[in-house]
Every structure is written in C-alpha cells, then in structure tokens.
Amino acid sequence: AAFKVVLDYNNGAVAMVLPQILRELNCSVIPLNAAPAEIVMEQDDSTFQAHLQEMGVITSAVKAKIGVFIDSPGERCFIVDETGTLLSHDQAFAVLTHLALSAKKGMVLGPASTSLAFSMIAEQLGGRFVPTKITPGAVLRAAQHSETVLASDGGGGFCWPDFAVSFDAIFTVARVLELLAVSGTSLGALRSRIPQVTHRTAVEFCPWEVKGRVMRTMMERHLKDRVDLTDGVKVFVDDGWVLVAPDPDRPEYYIIASTRDAGHANRLVEEYSQLVRSVVAEAAPQAEAVVET
C-alpha cells in the first residue's frame, strides 16, 4: 500500500522503530515530534486537543490516508481520518471493529460501557461484540479467548490477540494500514457508516458502604428482565440498554444509556440517576442512627 501517513511520535521511543516498519510497508511518512526525549512533558487537556487538531490539519493538507498520534509508551493512539477529522476513541474503535470483522469473523471485546453501535456493527458483519468489565486489565484478560480478533479499553488502547495480548499502538498502525489496503476503503467512509445511536453518561456520588445496596436494589427491580451482569447491572430495553455500574476507585456510580432514540437515552439516565440518589438518601439516616447508638 503506497499510503501517505502522518505520525506524531510525541517524542517517544516509538520513533526509533516504526519508520522502518512503515518503509517496509511501502508507506510515505510525514513525522511530527520524532526526536526521542528522556522526559516527555505532560500537556493540559486544551493544549493536547489543540495539538491533535493541528495534526488533523496537516493530515488533510498533505492528503494523507491517516494521521496517528502515539503516546510515549507506545500503547495508545489517537487517529485522524483522511479528511483531517479527529476520531473520538469510540469512533476509532468502531472503525477498527468494522475493518477487523470484515477481514476475519470472530469476537470484538470492549468495556460493558461501550456504545450500542458496536453490537450493531458486529451483527451486520457476522461477528459478535462481547462486553467485559470496564478496567483495561479486564479487557486484556478477556482478550485471551481464541475467537477474539480485536479488543479495546475504549481509551485509545487496541489489542490484536493474534499478535500479542497487550495494547500496542505500533502494531495498530501497521494492522490498520494493512486492512485499509485490503478493503480499499477509507477511515472517513467507515466513520460515516457508524450506526447512529445516543450514548449518555451521568455520574452520581455513592458512599462506599452504600454501593452494595444500589446493586441489590437494581437486581430486585429487574428480577424478570433481561440483564447483563458483566460489570454493574445492564438492563436491556426495546431500543438499547441502560447500565448502572460502580466506579472501582471512587465513591461514584456511572449511569450510562445507549439507545437508538435520543429522548429515551436521556430519560433512562435521569430515571436511574434518581434511583441511585434515592438509595443513597435512604441509607444516610440509617448510617447516622448507627453512629448515634
């Protein structure tokens, strides 16, 4: 594939390895920040986003097939399509899911919080999307299953188990270029084909000691409904699902709805946010009573 590729190495050691690989793939590389540095300075979010947008402008200007920013450890990447549009992590995962399942039928793995669109893409292509627990480690453990063709933590980490069970940005770049060459399509074309769903998220405070009560309340409320307990409680509704899941590190609950209808997603998030708030409120007087006695 004689593709033109814009690569921002973020001054990481990847710059010492990837150019040779891409030359062997007959790619023309426009390198950015390619001088490896011992210490890579962290950027605040607004500076980083501006940095990515700049990469998008360059990608479009030089008519490259793809632009990729790779983090310093070489694990995660941010992808820009040929129009210069920065793909969100969800969009990048969706596009890569389409490429992976078009090439080989199997399973794609991602956190239970991943959008409904992934199940729809997998179904269209004769594959399966299988949810995992939300942490990156859980995604990698599940990726060891022999049928897995792609796994992602939803945060720019992509794992191709036929190569290695780890998040590897170098291999991701090489594999995506290979799949684009074989399919004859573009990232922008695939992005435009991502199913339109509404994905809403809310976060509610929940003391550690009340987290179990929230889970019990959810289970009691949905005893006869179709649920998935991979992480938290996911309740399936007519046009999607709502997930109530505890944060493993903070006293919080995530309420996430993914549906075809935008209004329905908003209503589900509000309904289940209110449920978490009410359980927390009911528990507070009881906790005070225990302290007083």
State each model region's role.
Residues 1-183:
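Phosphate-binding chemistry for phosphorylated carbohydrates and sugar-nucleotides
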